[in-house]
Amino acid sequence: MNRQPDVADSPQTTRLDGRLSERLTGFAYRLGWKLICRVPEPWASWAFTTAADVAWRRQGPKVQVLEANLRRVLSYSDASPDVDGKELRALSRAALRSYARYWLEVFRLPVIPIARIMSGMHVNPAGEAALFANLKAGRGVIIALPHMGNFEQAGAWVVARGAGSFTTVAERLRPESVYEAFVRFREGLGMEVLPLTGGHSPFGILAQRLRAGRLVCLVSDRDLKETGVEVEMFGQQARIAATAALAVQTGAALLPVATWFEGPDWGAHIYEEIPVPESGTRGEKIVAMSQQLARVFEAAIAEHPADWHMLQRVFIADLDPARLPASRQADP
């Protein structure tokens, strides 16, 4: 006897369930944002650290991806394919706690005094001078960062330090209300936020801003649109964002930057500019600059591995073949 379709199986019901789930998620984010700003910081810190430890013990899919990435860091740094399991687990726990601190600070950033952001930020003087010298001269600057430390706090610092504002790109989160909340949050810090998808191509707008002598900040250690550049990082092939294409297109200064946590404070290193090669095709220049960028990221991550919050696959060997360009897929 055939089973009659249940109302719960209908497409209409599925769509309703999806919309309800998104609304509840959006409500939870907005409520959490308001509550965390009101809870005493030590209590909030304890709650976020505890949540990180629970996730670490459960060792779900995201934690497994994080550990796979960190395994490559340890293996390369130790020059050995054999990684001590206890060392890896200890590092992944520290990384999840660092990631939890990032989110706690994101939620609380609107109530952190500017004076605290300025006094707690430790930046190498030479890099800081180079960044603002370029901007003062009217030359556009691209800051390219890995997912390390608290780059949102670093953004608040660079605005307060005198950059005025900068432009960045954000992935569209679901539900839309959460994405809009993050856009408003970043705009409140002095950022112009462009959507990665669902709007005009961000590349053209970013190029306009750079030609106007503005600052652009992009997290660049992951290929978000499957149009990135293949590089070697930690002895493995990986795909990172083609941020270097903006420098080739506009002549803007490409400055790698790494951020990390220093006790209760924050550290940042602004590296020397990666120049556009004098010879080669446009594509060859982008690849060469991207490889240099990957080398800087590699060194920064190796120095502060617990502050690399990479819970997504970046290494070619770990990627789903369906996500690779046709030129990278194995022949049948």
Predicted regions and their residues:
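Short, composition-biased local secondary-structure segments
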Residues: 36-38, 150-156, 176, 205-219
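Conserved beta-strand termini and adjacent loop/short-helix elements that scaffold enzyme active sites
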Residues: 126, 169-171, 196, 271-273, ...
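Membrane-anchoring hydrophobic helices of lipid-metabolizing enzymes
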Residues: 2-142, 190
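Short amphipathic alpha-helical segments and helix-helix/interface helices
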Residues: 128-132, 155-159, 182-183, 206-207, ...
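Catalytic core of membrane glycerolipid acyltransferases/transacylases, capturing the structured
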Residues: 109, 137-198, 226-229, 262
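Soluble or luminal CAZymes and related metallo-dependent hydrolases
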Residues: 27, 62, 123, 198, ...
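A conditional alpha-helix N-cap/helix-loop micro-motif detector
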Residues: 121-124, 148, 175, 196-200, ...
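Non-catalytic C-terminal accessory region of glycerolipid acyltransferases
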Residues: 2-5, 12, 16-20, 80-84, ...
